[in-house]
A protein has these predicted regions:
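Short hydrophobic/aromatic-rich motifs at helix boundaries and adjacent loops
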Residues: 3-4, 25-28, 67-70, 159-161, ...
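N-terminal glycine-rich anion-binding loops that anchor highly charged ligand groups
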Residues: 29-33, 43-48, 198-201
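Ferredoxin-type iron-sulfur electron-transfer modules in oxidoreductases and energy-metabolism complexes
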Residues: 1-19, 38-129, 143-144, 223-227
Length: 280
């Protein structure tokens, strides 16, 4: 795809990355076959190819509108399109760049900003989300029967083996997983324990940063990433063999740390180390 990026982004790190990605796209449309929003809505602009055109226009100097933002908002960032792209277009990174530019050019209404801020505050805070989840489950008897059936029932995580092996790995707790699916990490710990490996959760870890990254708060996301890189690298230096990811979304985000921190002289190399040692 031929590009002619505008001056405001041409010589920036994001501009160079975007241009490289855009030039790979050959307009074939294979991506639309695996895009859930395109399959549901049937609108070219709600598929990867259409969104790539929208992003290209904005990066070439066309002013973004609320409609542009809406089409990018509808993208789930599932990156399923990347699995069928013969040109290996890195759509996930491109849509992040596009969203950040569009967010600046087409500011959201106050209510939307408030709602997204509340989502970031709630979902990325494990203790706050856990408390709200417990309160919510207590209200189940007050709900209509059909809604009550949708309420997630509390689960017992089961036994988590005590650390007793020389070999050990660490695992990301996640933000909502300890409340909604607490059995997963405990089950992973039991499986690894039978293989002679102890699994541990570093206490200081925080959200992987996906919530902020995908709701256009990149600075907050990078702060979380740096904190986790510090924790992961310390654990690796102390003998941990790997960083285990039991949530695919968190795993995908951590695998992107090296790309997102590529321009940070203090964290670029350490983020690559975390990437090489991450197991999803």
């Amino acid at each position: 795809m031929q590009t002619n990026l505008a001056d405001f982004i041409r010589d920036t790190s994001d501009g160079r990355a975007a241009e490289s990605i855009l030039r790979k796209c050959v307009h074939c449309g294979f991506c639309t076959a695996t895009c859930p929003t395109y399959q549901l809505l049937g609108d070219e602009l709600d598929g990867p190819r259409g969104r790539i055109y929208l992003i290209k226009q904005v990066l070439e100097g066309h002013t973004a509108t609320a409609t542009t933002r809406q089409h990018l908002d509808r993208c789930l960032t599932c990156r399923n399109c990347e699995t069928t792209c013969p040109s290996d277009v890195d759509y996930g990174h491109l849509v992040d760049i596009g969203r950040n530019v569009v967010e600046q050019q087409a500011p959201r209404p106050f209510i939307e900003r408030l709602f997204r801020g509340a989502l970031r505050t709630t979902l990325a805070n494990e203790s706050l989300f856990g408390t709200l989840h417990q309160v919510g489950t207590q209200l189940e008897p007050l709900l209509p029967k059909k809604l009550a059936e949708l309420v997630h029932k509390p689960e017992s995580p089961g036994i988590w083996p005590q650390p007793r092996h020389a070999r050990h790995m660490i695992v990301l707790r996640g933000c909502v997983q300890p409340s909604l699916a607490p059995r997963i990490n405990a089950a992973a710990a039991r499986v690894l324990d039978t293989l002679g490996i102890s699994l541990m959760e570093p206490r200081e870890q925080t959200c992987c940063g996906a919530v902020e990254q995908h709701t256009n708060a990149p600075k907050a996301a990078l702060q979380r990433m740096r904190r986790n890189v510090d924790i992961f690298c310390k654990a690796l230096d102390d003998g941990a063999e790997a960083i285990v990811m039991t949530a695919s979304g968190c795993g995908a985000m951590v695998r992107d740390y090296a790309h997102l921190l590529r321009d940070d002289p203090h964290y670029a190399a350490r983020a690559r180390s975390a990437l090489w040692n991450t197991r999803v």
